[in-house]
Design a protein with these regions (language model features):
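Signal-transmission linkers at sensory-effector interfaces
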Residues: 1-37
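GAF sensory/regulatory domain recognition
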Residues: 49-53, 60-90
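Amphipathic alpha-helical coiled-coil segments that mediate homodimerization
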Residues: 27-35, 40-56, 63, 183-186, ...
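A short, aliphatic-rich beta-strand micro-motif
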Residues: 105, 110-120, 126
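Regulatory loop-to-helix N-cap segments in sensory/regulatory domains
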Residues: 125-153
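Signal-transmission/dimerization alpha-helices at domain junctions
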Residues: 1-11, 136, 148-172
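… and, occasionally, acidic/histidine-rich disordered N-termini of signaling adaptors
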Residues: 171-215
C-alpha cells in the first residue's frame, strides 16, 4: 500500500478514516439541524435509530431518560421486552463512564455488551444500553471506537429533550401568570372596589386559577 503523507496510514485506512469522520459529521449535523428546526422529539429519535441501526449495524438498544420523577424508556429496539425489566436506579446508576459488560450478576444486563451513561452537570440524565454487537464489529469498526460518538449523539438529543421540557414548564408558568393578571383586571371591572360589609352582609371577591384548584 502507498502510505498516506505524514499520517503513516495506508491510503485505504486513511480513506476509511475520512469516510467515518464524514459520516459522523453529517450525522451530528442532521441531529442538530432537526433540533434547531424544532422537529418533534419522536422524529429526532427516529433519525437516531436510523443512524444506530442502519448505518452502524447495531441491532439491540435501550435508551432511558430521567424526567425528574422517574426513569423512562424513550427508545428501544431488539430488546425483547428487557426495557421493562431493568431497574435503572438499582442496576445502572453507579455507572459513570462507557462500560463494557463482560459478565454481570444482573441477568438482564448480560443481554447487552455496553452501557453508555449520559452525564450532565455531574448527574446521569440518561443511560444507553447496546447489545448484539458482532465479534468483528465489537473489536474493530464500528465497535467500541464508535461508542464516544454514539454517546455524543445521545447526549445532544437528551439535553434537547430536557431543554424542551424546561421551556414548556416556563411557558406554562407564564400562561398561568398572565391568566392571573388578566383575571385580576377582569375582577376590577366586574366588582366594585368597596363591596358592602355590615353585620347582615359580608361580601368579598377573589379569583382562584382553575389550574391551582383542579377545576
Amino acid at each position: 500500500h502507498y502510505m498516506g503523507l505524514k499520517t503513516g496510514l495506508p491510503t485505504s485506512k486513511l480513506t476509511q478514516k475520512l469516510e467515518q469522520n464524514e459520516f459522523k459529521l453529517s450525522s451530528l449535523l442532521e441531529i442538530t439541524k432537526a433540533i434547531n428546526n424544532n422537529v418533534p422529539i419522536q422524529t429526532i429519535l427516529k433519525i437516531f435509530e436510523y443512524i444506530i441501526r442502519e448505518q452502524l449495524g447495531i441491532s439491540k438498544l435501550i435508551l432511558y431518560t430521567n424526567n425528574q420523577v422517574k426513569w423512562d424508556c424513550i427508545l428501544h429496539f431488539g430488546s425483547r421486552g428487557l426495557n421493562k425489566k431493568i431497574n435503572v436506579d438499582k442496576e445502572l446508576s453507579h455507572i459513570q463512564e462507557i462500560t463494557v459488560i463482560e459478565s454481570s450478576s444482573i441477568e438482564t444486563l448480560n443481554s447487552f455488551d455496553v452501557v453508555i451513561p449520559i452525564i450532565h452537570k455531574k448527574n446521569p440524565i440518561a443511560y444507553l444500553l447496546i447489545g448484539d454487537l458482532e465479534e468483528e464489529l465489537f473489536n474493530i469498526s464500528p465497535g467500541l471506537k464508535h461508542m464516544p460518538f454514539i454517546q455524543t449523539l445521545a447526549s445532544i438529543i437528551v439535553v434537547a429533550i430536557e431543554n424542551k421540557r424546561f421551556s414548556n414548564e416556563i411557558l406554562e408558568q407564564e400562561i398561568n401568570n398572565k391568566e392571573m393578571e388578566l383575571a385580576g383586571e377582569m375582577q376590577k371591572l366586574l366588582f366594585p372596589v368597596d363591596l358592602p360589609s355590615n353585620q347582615q352582609l359580608d361580601v368579598a371577591a377573589r379569583y382562584e386559577s382553575k389550574h391551582l384548584v383542579g377545576g
